[in-house]
Amino acid sequence: MSTEVYDGAIGIDLGTTYSCVATYEGSNVEIIANEQGSFTTPSFVSFTADERLIGEAAKNQAAMNPANTVFDVKRLIGRRFDDPTVKKDMESWPFKVVDEDGNPKVEVEYLGTTHKFSPQEISAMVLVKMKEIAEAKIGKKVEKAVITVPAYFNDNQRQSTKDAGAISGLNVLRIINEPTAAAIAYGLGSGKSEKERNVLIYDLGGGTFDVSLLNIQGGVFTVKATAGDTHLGGQDFDTNLLDHCKKDFQRKTKKDLSGDARALRRLRTACERAKRTLSNGTQTTLEIDSLFDGEDFSLQITRAKFEELNQTAFKGTLDPVTQVLKDAGVDKAAVDEIVLVGGSTRIPKIQKLLSDYFGGKKLEKSINPDEAVAYGAAVQAGILSGKATSAETADLLLLDVVPLSLGVAMEGNIFAPVVPRGTTVPTLKKRSFTTVADQQQTVQFPVYQGERTNCSENVSLGEFTLAPIPPMRAGEPVLEVVFEVDVNGILKVTATEKTSGRSANITIANSVGKLSTSEIENMISEAEKYKTNDEEFTKKHEAKQQLESYIARVEDIISDPTLALKLKRGQKEKIENTMSEAMAQLELGESTADDLKKKELALKRAVTKAMSSR
């Protein structure tokens, strides 16, 4: 390869299980094969006493070196070590994940010593491999790329992916959403048409799942809504089959292979192969010689059995479809095309469930499900680097959206959304806040992402402080908060105090959020389910604030000597007693909004009576 630098950019689909790379020049997209001739490369990195292997070579020797072969790193990136999904995944991973300041690190033996790598570093190794595959074909050094992420990735996961790109030595021109990239591949390919239409992208990969509804007209691709599950894919279907095989092996041999990483890796590889076979045939046999403790393993699996083992997971993929249609306000009948993306959409049962959901509608299979995302990323890379010269990309415009609302925590840990979910990016939104205490000179701005009223049920993205601000009475300062989401879906927040002009900002990066999958997957549906709780939480907080504010005013009245003298004997005592009852009610954690309102009313009556009978 020459030292000359390629003036274009490559498109990389950085997948959980497999990755893919492509280029776009003129009007031609090329998916680039690796040295084995495959168009997809396993997202595996293996460490040995002598070397580091990436891709096919790493996956091929995973069974011999399970503790030092890392995969599934996309399920770690941008997450906290204490995330329940990380904990659950760790149970099945043969490699070691350790806690370092709340962040997960992969621990391996490499070149004779123990090394710890962050998920970003492992992802960067896969990106370097994809870059090298492209360089071998182009014959020049590649420095620029567009990388894809699941549409439902939060801010932490997006920023971490961008960081992985930087670690790999790539200038990441853009982070784009996988279903949007696939829509470009479809919209510019066989699905090209000037007619306006609603296209549903159903993207089920090895480890993540996205559904996006786009409106496509000419070269304008507008995402109307997006939903998904950042922790569901083909790997999970393999695991369900693997668990069935483990039980069958134990039943036949009375031996438990759960603790043997090598046996589990061999069995998982056989399960993945069986799953693929069952997409074409109706039955297959898993056969592994000397699987564990000298025992051979053989099991016949039918397609029906595989579908039964994954029944819940398969049906669950329809929930985000329902969510997307609801959010977009589009009826099933108004969906013109359903496009399948991701290797797992080859499973016949998945196709049947989806087609039945849309009343037997024919599914669109004209694009290669493994390559569509890289194809779209390459088109975007070509446009951004000036390599795309065709007429069909001249008017290409991508309008993507924020998958979950972004905002700040107010007094009482109430979530104040600044950018609602579904907002087209890039965007700039402003909202004004004020202080809660007299002479307050410091204001904290905790930033969250999610759909719940109570911030503790959303994802923390980090916080920053605005200080010092001029001391004023509570409620007087005007604090303007600006949320700016760029084309990569990455957030920058700025807060300014208007009189002094003092400002502070944060680009949310590496302040990794405590994201549990159950939160990100169910945030919207939970928000519906717990709406009553959320409303009660808000009402109680407002009632509490009102009562506290009124008590403060009454205290001012009775402590003012001129006003106090005007009160009849006994009236002041009545007010004080009523006020004590109200304060006691405030202390009770289980008080409802109504309880607090009643106490406020009683206190108002006591004050009114005392004043009117002077």
Swiss-Prot record:
PROSITE patterns: HSP70_1, HSP70_2, HSP70_3. Signal peptide: none annotated. Residues 404-614 are annotated as: Substrate binding domain (SBD). A motif (Nuclear export signal) lies at residues 575-583. InterPro entries: ATPase_NBD, Heat_shock_70_CS, HSP70_C_sf, HSP70_peptide-bd_sf, Hsp_70_fam. Its EC number is 3.6.4.10. It catalyses: ATP + H2O = ADP + phosphate + H(+). One of its GO terms (cellular component) is cytosol. Residues 1-392 are annotated as: Nucleotide binding domain (NBD). Chaperone that interacts with the histone acetyltransferase HAT1 and mediates its translocation from the nucleus to the cytoplasm during germination and starvation conditions. Within the cytoplasm, HAT1 regulates autophagy via acetylation of the autophagy-related proteins ATG3 and ATG9. This is Heat shock protein SSB1. It comes from Pyricularia oryzae (strain 70-15 / ATCC MYA-4617 / FGSC 8958).
